[in-house]
Amino acid sequence: VVAIFFVGWILMYATRTIFNPVMGVIGEQFGLSNTQLGLANSIFFLTYAVAQIPFGMIGDKIGRKLVIAVGFIVLAISTYFSGLATTFVMFLVIRAIAGIGQGAYYGPQYALSTEAIPASKRTIGNAIINSGMAFGTSGGYLLSSKLVLENGEHWSKPFFIMAIPTFIVGILFYTILKEKVIRPGEEAARAAAEEGPQEKISLKEIFSNRNLLAAFILCFTSIYANFVIITWLPQFLIAERGFTGASVGFISSLVPWASIPGALIFARLNDKTGATKKLVFTLV
């Protein structure tokens, strides 16, 4: 489970960041301003964010692995068709659909990984899964900058390439993943929990939970800053610092690579000490 979800996050972020190094090239082809280029990213993240709650609810009802698999297939197809777009409006619509496909992954993935990973190793397990984001960000940067900026290939080629492994992994998700994984020694506890009264939690209770609200705010501020950097850093290096070719992808990749050691070290520390609140406070 950890391995396949790790690969999933690699592809999730690679299919996003292949766009960033070639923003200028696409802008020249369609005659776009930086504002319009920003819109292409914004529409993707808007549909990605909006889709997460509905897909989480659907996953709870019909099965998480089905939602993840279908989402990845949609992502693969929309990534491929992104490279076929002949107008900016068409590109926007396709990227919006790609965002919807990615929105199907986030909630169901964490639900399944939480079920599958033992509690004593849950933080480090999720940290390993999440480190796929850094690998994917770096891979997307390097692929686009190497093929398009250095080799002079058409900007669509990275989209065509990334669609293939994304489609394959979508199929693997459906064939490999299992719902409600029961680990050895936990059968009795799981059976007792399922026999007892099942408490239903409403969305109102979720959004009124103080700890969850604090987590929402913390995630929003940190993720916002992170995505501003990974979205515009390649374009900044090209336009303002004069970098060319694969060096754009390499330098941009330093940001995600730097996050991996810290994530794994502090995740392991949290599993050992259980001092989640103190660690979060210290890091913030």
Residue ranges and their predicted role:
Residues 17, 45-53, 137-138, 256-264:
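Residue-level signature of mid-helix packing/kink "hotspots" within the transmembrane helices
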Residues 19-20, 210-263:
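Extracytoplasmic gate region of multi-pass secondary transporters
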Residues 50-87:
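Conserved MFS/SLC helix-loop-helix module at the cytosolic interface between two early adjacent transmembrane helices
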Residues 61-71, 271-284:
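Cytoplasmic membrane-interface "Motif A"-like loop-to-helix N-cap segments
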Residues 94-135:
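Cytoplasmic helix-loop-helix junction between adjacent transmembrane helices
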Residues 129-179:
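Helix-loop-helix hairpin linking two adjacent transmembrane segments in secondary transporters
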Residues 182-215:
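Juxtamembrane intracellular "pre-TM" segments in multi-pass secondary transporters
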